[in-house]
């Protein structure tokens, strides 16, 4: 995939469920539609929670790296 232009980076390293998703929700609401939030996490629950959050809240998970921590997720606000 080509380089993704990130609007904001959210570091949730060391935080455990439900904190990472709560911070994603808080931060993404301050972005405009189409802007990109890069989430960096080490909680294994995020591999399930971030994709579910995107689907439920109608955001787009553009890319993820979940082979080993730290996990990275590129989320576009909106569809």
Swiss-Prot record:
GO terms for cellular component: cytoplasm. GO terms for biological process: tRNA wobble position uridine thiolation. The active site is at 17 (cysteine persulfide intermediate). Sulfur carrier protein which probably makes part of a sulfur-relay system. This is Sulfur carrier protein TusA. It is found in: Cytoplasm. Its main location: cytoplasm. Gene3D superfamilies: TusA-like domain. It comes from Haemophilus influenzae (strain PittGG). Disulfide bonds: none annotated. Keywords: Cytoplasm. The keyword Cytoplasm applies. The keyword Cytoplasm applies. NCBIfam families: PRK00299.1. Belongs to the sulfur carrier protein TusA family. One of its GO terms (molecular function) is sulfur carrier activity. HAMAP family: Thiourid_synth_A. SUPFAM superfamilies: SirA-like. Pfam families: TusA (PF01206).
